[in-house]
A protein has these predicted regions:
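C-terminal substrate-recognition "lid" of short-chain dehydrogenase/reductases
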Residues: 119-122, 130, 134, 212-241, ...
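Active-site helix of classical SDR
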Residues: 122, 158, 166
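Residue(s) in the substrate-gating loop at a strand-loop-helix junction
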Residues: 142
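Short, small/polar-rich loop/turn modules that mediate ligand/substrate recognition or access, typified
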Residues: 174, 179, 234-236
Length: 247
C-alpha cells in the first residue's frame, strides 16, 4: 500500500520548486493532490506535465492571503472529497531590503502571504479535519528562522513566526488527531537559486557541512514523512533539512 493512499492533500505554492516536487511525490504515493497557487497559467501547465508522467492532480488559482477565497476553496475540496487529510503550507515569497530601505509595503506583502496566508489556510481547513478526527499540517519554515539573515527582516519574521505557530497549534490540536509540524529547509537548488553566479553558489556550498545544496525532492521527502503514518507521534517539531548548516 502506498504511504498516502486515499489521502486528500492540499499543497499551497505547489506548481514550482519544492511545491512541484512535493506534488509529484505525493501523487506517486497515492494522494489525491490539490494545488493552490496564484499563477493560473503556470498551474495549468504543471498539471499537464504531471499528466505526461502518468500522475494526477488538480489545480485551483487561490491567493492564500485572501481569507475568504481560501475558505471558499477549502469548502469546494471538502464538498468534492468529503474530507481534507493533509495541508502543506508551502507558499512563500521574499522581498528583501535592509531595515533602512525596507518599506512598510514590502514588510506587509511578505507577512500577508507567508505568515497570514499559512494561518488562513489552517483556519479554513482545520474544521474539516476536526470533523474526521484526523489531520496532518506541515508548515514551511526556513533555516534563517533559526539564526537570522541580513536584509530579510520581513521574511525571517514570517519563518520564525511559523515555528511559533506550529508549536502552539500542535498543543491545541494534538489531542484531536491533528499533528502540526514544520520543515526548515536550508539552501535548496531551485531554478531561482541555480541562476545565481557560480561564486555565490560556491559561497553557499561552503556553509553546508555536506558540501552541496539540497534538492527540492529532499524537502518533499520531509513533507511526505511528516504527512504519513510513520510520523504519527511527531507533533510540534521543526525538522531542519539543511545539510547540517544549523549545527
Amino acid at each position: 500500500m502506498k504511504r498516502l493512499e486515499n489521502r486528500v492533500a492540499i499543497i499551497t505554492g505547489g506548481t514550482a520548486g519544492i511545491g512541484a516536487a512535493t506534488a509529484i511525490k505525493f501523487a506517486q504515493e497515492g494522494a489525491k493532490v490539490i494545488l493552490w497557487a496564484r499563477n493560473a497559467e503556470r498551474g495549468k501547465a504543471f498539471i499537464e506535465s504531471m499528466k505526461a508522467q502518468g500522475l494526477e492532480a488538480e489545480f485551483e488559482a487561490v491567493d492564500s492571503s485572501n481569507y475568504e477565497a481560501v475558505c471558499e476553496a477549502a469548502k469546494r475540496v471538502n464538498d468534492k472529497y468529503g474530507k481534507i487529510d493533509i495541508l502543506i503550507n508551502n507558499a512563500g515569497i521574499t522581498n528583501d531590503s535592509t531595515l533602512k530601505k525596507m518599506t512598510v509595503e514590502q514588510w506587509q506583502q511578505v507577512i500577508d502571504i507567508n505568515l497570514s496566508g499559512s494561518f488562513y489556510c489552517i483556519k479554513a481547513i482545520t474544521p474539516y479535519m476536526l470533523e474526521k478526527g484526523y489531520g496532518r499540517i506541515v508548515n514551511a519554515s526556513s533555516v534563517v528562522a533559526l539564526y537570522g539573515n541580513f536584509g530579510q527582516t520581513n521574511y525571517v519574521a514570517t519563518k520564525a513566526g511559523l515555528i511559533g505557530m506550529t508549536k502552539t497549534l500542535a498543543r491545541e490540536l494534538g489531542k484531536k488527531g491533528i499533528t502540526v509540524n514544520a520543515v526548515a529547509p536550508g539552501f535548496i537548488e531551485t531554478d531561482m537559486v541555480a541562476k545565481m553566479p557560480e561564486n555565490v553558489l560556491d559561497g553557499m556550498r561552503a556553509k553546508v557541512p555536506v558540501g552541496r545544496l539540497g534538492q527540492p525532492e529532499e524537502i518533499a521527502s520531509a513533507y511526505l514523512f511528516l504527512a504519513s503514518e510513520e510520523a504519527a507521534y511527531i507533533n510540534g517539531a521543526t525538522l531542519s533539512v539543511d545539510g547540517g548548516m544549523t549545527i
